[in-house]
Amino acid sequence: SWNPPFCGDLDIRIARNGTWFYLGTPIGRFELVKLFSSILKVEDGKYFLVTPVEKVGIQVDDAPFIAVDFNEMEINGEKALKFETHVGDQVIANVENPIRVERDAVSDEPAPYIHIRNGLDALIDRKTFYRLVEIGQHKKHENENWFGIESASSFFPIIKSEDLDNSI
């Protein structure tokens, strides 16, 4: 694991929609964004691009990645959901890569995420979240009824069943 010296902040920002900006201008080259995403690290809630010789800070508005799709598959006879990010990372939702849903404090809108690697998350885009909800199910979780998603022998609660029933 590289531990190069911190060399200051770069004017690079990852917007909530996954767009990377340099000096306020979108980075249009996918290959460059993919390269940068491969050296992205998070430490104590701060984001860095890390190479063997330097470490620079960048700004991330929400999550650094966007989960743009998932596929249902079987692993050892069990259903699993394989997610893909906008930069091509693929992960299976499981104990190591859990799905979680946070609620916006003002609007109460759900903000769904999946862990990608080393503390880095992807915001699950709206169309993908709607597809997830279509395959969701009600299940007992920590002694309460929840609506959630099952993948790789793990259950990921989205909303309490009673809250879902009250919101319809």
Show where each model-derived region lies:
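Long, non-globular segments of proteins
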Residues: S1-I168
